[in-house]
Amino acid sequence: MTAAWLDYWDGSHATYVNARHKDVHYRLIANDIAQLVPSPQARVLDYGCGDALHASIVAAAAGELVLCEAAPRTRARLTARFGGNQGTGRNPKIRVIAPEEMERLPDHSFGLIVVHSVIQYLTKHETEALLSVFQRLLQPGSILIIGDVIPPRGRASSDALALLRLAAANGFFIATLAGLVRLLFSDYRSLRGQLGLTRYEEGEIIQMLSAAGFAPQRAPKNIGHDQARLAFVASPRSAGRL
């Protein structure tokens, strides 16, 4: 991820129209991930988790939840929220790490790895490098989920409509109308115009995952509210399988 994108996500930004939006966003993602946890004993990695306000929902469904976040201020908030000695949300099943710590973890550490709304901010080379790490970290028969993949024909208008539907169903519709106007003049729109977002055809992701040693397929639904975006599920192939 470029320093510009990392600084954006680690700062004060206009992506969420208000606190209600942010809460609903993270609760929906946590509920969706919790349903994917393969067993109550599974160790789960959420890579690029952001503020993960409702990580406790995922942790309740798993043996352990590891939150991996590159943005230092966001990571500090996560540690204070879930791992601090005095934090009201302290949860012994949640661990917060940086990407460099993840890369030092032993082989076969996880039964589920989730990468949601991340790879559009990475180059294809960066994503390929990550897949190699994930392939090593996953246990035999475990699962990798890549969510919020933007197809080449994905439009900002589709994202806006999905957000408006979410807002209407959850009581922040008027705030969203104002928030979308603010977003037009925000750093996000400027960065998106300058740096772009990495987009993938379905077949391109399938090929990339296959080359990294996974048996992949498109998931029936995306994690979260935006079903115009894609999600993929993959399991590491055993050494004897081609």
Predicted regions: what they are:
Residues 114:
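A conserved beta-strand element that flanks and buttresses the S-adenosyl-L-methionine
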Residues 128-140:
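A short glycine-rich, Lys/Arg-flanked "PGG" loop and its adjoining helix->strand segment in the class I
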Residues 123-124:
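Helix-capping/helix-break motifs at membrane-protein junctions
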Residues 43, 64, 109-111:
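Structural signature of beta-strand start/N-cap positions in the alpha/beta core
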Residues 47:
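Conserved beta-strand/loop positions that form the S-adenosyl-L-methionine
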Residues 1-37, 41, 51-104, 145-242:
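Class I (Rossmann-like) S-adenosyl-L-methionine-dependent methyltransferase catalytic domain
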Residues 117-118:
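Short catalytic micro-motifs in class I SAM-dependent methyltransferases
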